[in-house]
Design a protein with these regions (language model features):
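A short, flexible loop at the N-terminus of ABC-type nucleotide-binding domains that lies
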Residues: 1-6, 10-23, 28-35
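The feature captures the beta-strand-to-loop junction immediately N-terminal to the Walker
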Residues: 37-39
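Helix-to-loop junction immediately C-terminal to a conserved catalytic motif
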Residues: 52
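Conserved ABC transporter NBD signature motif
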Residues: 60-76
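Conserved ABC ATPase "signature" region
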Residues: 109-124
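Conserved ABC ATPase signature
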Residues: 128-132, 136
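Catalytic Walker B motif of ABC-type/P-loop ATPase nucleotide-binding domains
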Residues: 153-157
Length: 176
């Protein structure tokens, strides 16, 4: 399994001073669980966006398995913050989880069912996202992330909107 290395990342939103990130370096080893902790506005989501390849740093380099991230993005999956998504979009749970899959073969259907079962929402597969609770939406996002063939998973506030027992279940799923 490849590791992800970020070296001296700097990122600014237009002419923002100081930059959102300034010379940040880190190494994510295979099989580890790492948490980014800090106050709101500290740049955690910005860093995750860079590490996933959604944005490019102004300076610095990101590699996965020794190769530039741009050539190896399939190794990295991002579960975005729940609040950053438009939950009124008319789509079902299974539609969200399978979104972006090129073919919907029998194996894709089996993977979909396994992902929904793994996060405990297979009974909600046909329900629209806007009819779900915040915690159920969070589980749908995790199922979508788990459908990804990546080896590195970046989760942005994965336990928001979850009650304490659900947080514990969620962390068990993530550790697996």
């Amino acid at each position: 399994m490849p590791c992800l290395i970020a070296e001296n990342l700097t990122y600014s939103y237009s002419t923002q001073i100081p930059p959102a990130l300034n010379k940040v370096s880190l190494k994510l080893e295979p099989g580890t669980l790492t948490a980014l902790v800090g106050p709101n506005g500290a740049g955690k989501s910005t860093l995750l966006s860079l590490l996933q390849g959604s944005s490019r740093p102004d300076q610095g380099e990101i590699t996965v398995g020794g190769k530039p991230l741009i050539n190896n993005r399939a190794q990295v999956a991002l579960m975005p913050q729940r609040g950053k998504l438009n939950w009124s979009f008319p789509i079902t749970v299974e539609g969200l989880v399978s979104l972006g899959r090129v073919n919907h073969s029998k194996s894709t259907c089996c993977e979909l069912e396994a992902a929904l079962q793994r996060v405990g929402i297979s009974h909600l597969a046909k329900r629209r996202l806007d009819s779900l609770s915040g915690g159920q939406q969070q589980r749908a996002l995790l199922a979508k992330t788990l459908m990804n063939p990546a080896n590195i998973f970046l989760l942005d506030e994965p336990c928001s909107a979850l009650d304490p027992p659900a947080k514990e279940d969620f962390l068990i799923i993530i550790r697996q």
